[in-house]
């Protein structure tokens, strides 16, 4: 014990004597100029380091004061609560837009009677929106945790355009899911058909298989109808962010008449309308009511009963339905078989329509009235056109003329002597395609900046007449269908060509409006939502309603209500 104390005392004495020994050694040194400089530099450096350390310590102390001291569990709870609040706000905005999508989907299928099915679709989209919004908002907040409070968090501004884009993303995701379901179900049906040859069973098993086949076919038809409506809705959404040309503006007018969303109170919420002539909308409440009545007759029940369409689909798949030109993409059909099946049904419906004399009078009078209004808009006298038009109608009213007409049309590749094939397909749609791709000679004249408008119009008229004159020389029947048709075209084609290819004017707007209404009528009659493919009578009735509605819109737009005189028939 004494030795330990002795060692400790020696250690303390040496520690106390160490500064004295250092001081004595410094006093013995001779202060040379170099040593003084070294000591001065060392002193200054030491003082600088002390001040720098104090400054850094002060700054670190401020940060510690600003940062709230929380326990790990509380910090995780606050972060999760913050994420939940942000996720709920984002998901609520997307769900609101999704609800609007669901409400717009309900407009084509009798919103009160058919709200359950559409609510299922919108409910699935809401769940998808909530999942995606929570993930996206959680990522944003997780990135902001590592930042200090001095840095501002950049949150995207909520604008109608952003909400629109978010809704379109969700809508496209739903479309992909439906397409996958349709593809998967079709593939499964094909596999079952391939394996049906080796299946053996009793009568009960065969009956169960037949019931499953019926349910499967019904599901596929409903899914196809839903996809067709969704494609139409997607195109209408894409056109909402800008409409500068008359065709798109006519599209807006059409959507104002076709898309009327009924809310819980039953009131119509009509969207803002855009008129081609920059005037107020000419749609009336009565027209919207008629539109809703027609939609009530073409509700969701028609999606379950397509007896006429199913029979036509079997014929189309067997290759027994023929046409001159496939219009699958133009008329927004799901495929060539879908187009041919609907075409077969529409041919039967038009055959039923033409059998009634009042329908023939309506069709002839409507054509004369609208085309005469177009010529009047071009500031020309429609007298020659009306005379040629009446001569052609009188020729077609004679039963003995149809043998010649059939021979002429068969030589042009006509597959069926029907109103759709002759008027809508051969005359109307082919003419619209020709006007979209005019000859180079006409294009060069119209694009020439050194020519005035009157000279361009004269040149376009001369080009049309020369083409028609050449076609007349190639006719095999001098007084047949094409002779009368070319006589009508001599008065009408120059007006149409100048209206579509000429400068922006009231004639150009009217031509674009006519084209838009024609295309929407054609798409309407190929749409399960607008017409009923249950039987020929209902389909013919719905086609006539669509035609009358489009005609009324066009007549109101052209301001030709006073010119409703019936055609003179011999």
UniProtKB/Swiss-Prot annotation:
Pfam families: Miga
Primary location class: mitochondrion
Record carries keyword Transmembrane: yes
Family label: Belongs to the mitoguardin family.
GO biological process, one term: mitochondrial fusion
Function as written in the Swiss-Prot or TrEMBL entry: Regulator of mitochondrial fusion: acts by forming homo- and heterodimers at the mitochondrial outer membrane and facilitating the formation of pld6/MitoPLD dimers. May act by regulating phospholipid metabolism via pld6/MitoPLD.
Keywords linked to the UniProt accession: Membrane, Mitochondrion, Mitochondrion outer membrane, Transmembrane, Transmembrane helix
Top-level lineage group: Eukaryota
Membrane topology: Single-pass membrane protein
Record note on quaternary structure: Homodimer and heterodimer; forms heterodimers with miga2.
Stated name of the protein: Mitoguardin 1
GO molecular function terms attached to this record: protein heterodimerization activity; protein homodimerization activity
Keyword Mitochondrion: yes
Listed transmembrane segments: 34-54
GO cellular component: mitochondrial outer membrane; plasma membrane
Record's subcellular location: Mitochondrion outer membrane
């Amino acid at each position: 014990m004494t030795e330990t104390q002795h060692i400790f005392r020696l250690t303390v004495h040496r520690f106390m004597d160490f500064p004295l020994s250092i001081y004595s050694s410094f006093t013995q040194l001779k202060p040379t100029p170099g040593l003084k400089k070294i000591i001065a530099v060392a002193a200054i450096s030491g003082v600088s380091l002390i001040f720098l350390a104090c400054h850094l310590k002060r700054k670190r102390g401020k940060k510690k004061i600003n940062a709230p001291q929380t326990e790990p569990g509380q910090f995780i709870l606050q972060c999760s609560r913050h994420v939940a609040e942000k996720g709920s706000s984002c998901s609520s905005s997307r769900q609101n837009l999704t609800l609007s999508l669901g409400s717009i989907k309900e407009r084509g299928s009798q919103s009160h009677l058919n709200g359950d099915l559409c609510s299922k679709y919108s409910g699935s989209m809401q769940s998808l929106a909530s999942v995606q919004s929570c993930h996206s908002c959680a990522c944003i907040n997780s990135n902001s945790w590592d930042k200090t409070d001095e840095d501002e968090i950049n949150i995207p501004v909520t604008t109608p355009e952003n909400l629109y884009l978010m809704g379109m993303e969700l809508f496209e995701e739903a479309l992909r899911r439906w397409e996958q379901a349709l593809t998967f179900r079709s593939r499964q049906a094909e596999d079952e058909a391939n394996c049906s040859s080796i299946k053996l069973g009793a009568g009960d098993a065969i009956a169960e298989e037949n019931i499953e086949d019926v349910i499967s076919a019904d599901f596929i038809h409903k899914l196809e109808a839903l996809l067709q409506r969704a494609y139409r809705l997607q195109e209408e959404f894409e056109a909402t962010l800008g409409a500068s040309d008359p065709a798109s503006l006519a599209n807006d007018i059409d959507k104002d008449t076709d898309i009327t969303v009924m809310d819980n109170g039953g009131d119509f919420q009509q969207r803002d309308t855009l008129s081609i002539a920059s005037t107020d909308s000419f749609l009336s409440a009565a027209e919207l009511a008629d539109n809703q009545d027609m939609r009530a007759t073409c509700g969701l029940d028609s999606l379950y009963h397509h007896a006429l369409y199913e029979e036509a689909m079997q014929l189309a798949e067997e290759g027994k339905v023929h046409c001159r030109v496939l219009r699958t993409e133009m008329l927004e059909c799901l495929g060539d078989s879908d187009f041919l099946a609907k075409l077969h049904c529409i041919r039967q419906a038009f055959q039923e329509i033409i059998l009634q004399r009042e329908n023939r009078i309506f069709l002839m009078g409507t054509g004369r009235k609208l085309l005469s209004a177009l010529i009047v808009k071009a500031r020309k006298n429609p007298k020659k056109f009306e005379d040629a038009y009446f001569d052609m109608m009188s020729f077609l009213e004679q039963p003995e003329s149809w043998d010649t007409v059939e021979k002429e049309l068969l030589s042009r590749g006509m597959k069926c002597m029907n109103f759709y094939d002759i008027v809508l397909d051969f005359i109307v749609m082919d003419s619209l395609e020709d006007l979209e791709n005019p000859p180079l000679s006409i294009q060069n004249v119209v694009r020439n900046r050194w020519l005035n408008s009157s000279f361009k119009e004269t040149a376009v008229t001369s080009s049309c007449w020369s083409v028609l004159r050449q076609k007349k020389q190639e006719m095999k029947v001098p007084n047949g269908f094409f002779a009368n048709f070319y006589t009508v075209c001599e008065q009408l084609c120059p007006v149409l060509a100048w209206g579509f290819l000429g400068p922006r004017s009231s004639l150009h707007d009217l031509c674009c409006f006519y084209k838009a209404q024609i295309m929407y009528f054609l798409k309407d009659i190929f749409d399960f939502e607008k017409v009923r493919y249950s039987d020929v009578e209902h389909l013919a009735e719905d086609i006539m309603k669509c035609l009358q509605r489009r005609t009324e819109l066009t007549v109101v737009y052209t301001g030709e209500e006073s010119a409703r005189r019936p055609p003179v028939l011999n």
